[in-house]
Amino acid sequence: MATKPQDANTTSREAITSKADSPPRPTALIFDSGVGGLSVYQEIRQLLPNLHYIYAFDNVAFPYGEKSGEFIVERVLEIVTAVQQRHPLAIVVIACNTASTVSLPALRERFAFPVVGVVPAIKPAVRLTRNGVVGLLATRATVHASYTLDLIARFATDCKIELLGSSELVEVAETKLHGGVVPLEVLKKILHPWLSMREPPDTIVLGCTHFPLLTEELAQVLPEGTRMVDSGAAIARRTAWLISSQENVVSSQDENIAYCMALDEDTDALLPVLQSYGFPKLQKLPI
């Protein structure tokens, strides 16, 4: 049986409802270098189920953790601009800790809509710790960012902060979301600096949006009773407040859509996952 030819820039399934059936909704762009931002999107969608969501990820330049700050700023500006030219955006969430630490000032200077960033949840972790030892698990770029060091200086002076930067763990999270198995031995190797401590952190800040995707596996490797904290819920509350504070907010009747920077076998395999998150279409974003 013959099938309709598919646009080389699009992977999709048939829309269940037509555009005319959809009420206008404010459009929120969620951006990450990979699929870790879906953990933040989940938190936002739970609080704001009726927004029009766009998820964009940079699978060409992924991962950002080893890139220069200058490269990340220019790349994020380019991608957000490309999306903004196609959709009337009400808000943008940079669901990437590495990108947030360097790109927010430039984004807020260029665009009129609010831009929300993700920063390590150090302040709540300090409140939760019982032994006074808090671990920050993030990319190397986030661990060494001046913004992160400022957060520690402001909120964690009474605690011992153990920093652990790993881009390998980002790759592990991506593998899991693509349907792969997470080897616990790999996690043990990554976390060895903490696991070998006489008094390891009892509270861990998941300072990369990929890492909440691995909470079950991390719990099997970390000492029993270790608490894990991320900023997803706080970002969702901030997003809700900013949306509610806008007057004459721009809206769209389009269905949710995901954008990548290149279509390949990996993105083809990722489509069912994106559909399960509420994104029926995946397209290449021309930049």
Swiss-Prot record:
<dbReference type="InterPro" id="IPR018187">
    <property type="entry name" value="Asp/Glu_racemase_AS_1"/>
</dbReference>
<comment type="similarity">
    <text>Belongs to the aspartate/glutamate racemases family.</text>
</comment>
<dbReference type="GO" id="GO:0071555">
    <property type="term" value="P:cell wall organization"/>
</dbReference>
<keyword id="KW-0961">Cell wall biogenesis/degradation</keyword>
<dbReference type="InterPro" id="IPR015942">
    <property type="entry name" value="Asp/Glu/hydantoin_racemase"/>
</dbReference>
<dbReference type="GO" id="GO:0009252">
    <property type="term" value="P:peptidoglycan biosynthetic process"/>
</dbReference>
<dbReference type="InterPro" id="IPR033134">
    <property type="entry name" value="Asp/Glu_racemase_AS_2"/>
</dbReference>
<dbReference type="InterPro" id="IPR001920">
    <property type="entry name" value="Asp/Glu_race"/>
</dbReference>
<feature type="active site" description="Proton donor/acceptor">
    <location>
        <position position="96"/>
    </location>
</feature>
<feature type="binding site">
    <location>
        <begin position="32"/>
        <end position="33"/>
    </location>
    <ligand>
        <name>substrate</name>
    </ligand>
</feature>
<dbReference type="InterPro" id="IPR004391">
    <property type="entry name" value="Glu_race"/>
</dbReference>
<keyword id="KW-0573">Peptidoglycan synthesis</keyword>
<feature type="binding site">
    <location>
        <begin position="97"/>
        <end position="98"/>
    </location>
    <ligand>
        <name>substrate</name>
    </ligand>
</feature>
<comment type="function">
    <text>Provides the (R)-glutamate required for cell wall biosynthesis.</text>
</comment>
<protein>
    <recommendedName>
        <fullName>Glutamate racemase</fullName>
        <ecNumber>5.1.1.3</ecNumber>
    </recommendedName>
</protein>
<feature type="binding site">
    <location>
        <begin position="209"/>
        <end position="210"/>
    </location>
    <ligand>
        <name>substrate</name>
    </ligand>
</feature>
<feature type="compositionally biased region" description="Polar residues">
    <location>
        <begin position="1"/>
        <end position="15"/>
    </location>
</feature>
<feature type="binding site">
    <location>
        <begin position="64"/>
        <end position="65"/>
    </location>
    <ligand>
        <name>substrate</name>
    </ligand>
</feature>
<keyword id="KW-0413">Isomerase</keyword>
<feature type="active site" description="Proton donor/acceptor">
    <location>
        <position position="208"/>
    </location>
</feature>
<comment type="pathway">
    <text>Cell wall biogenesis; peptidoglycan biosynthesis.</text>
</comment>
<keyword id="KW-0133">Cell shape</keyword>
<feature type="region of interest" description="Disordered">
    <location>
        <begin position="1"/>
        <end position="25"/>
    </location>
</feature>
<dbReference type="Pfam" id="PF01177">
    <property type="entry name" value="Asp_Glu_race"/>
</dbReference>
<dbReference type="GO" id="GO:0008881">
    <property type="term" value="F:glutamate racemase activity"/>
</dbReference>
<dbReference type="GO" id="GO:0008360">
    <property type="term" value="P:regulation of cell shape"/>
</dbReference>
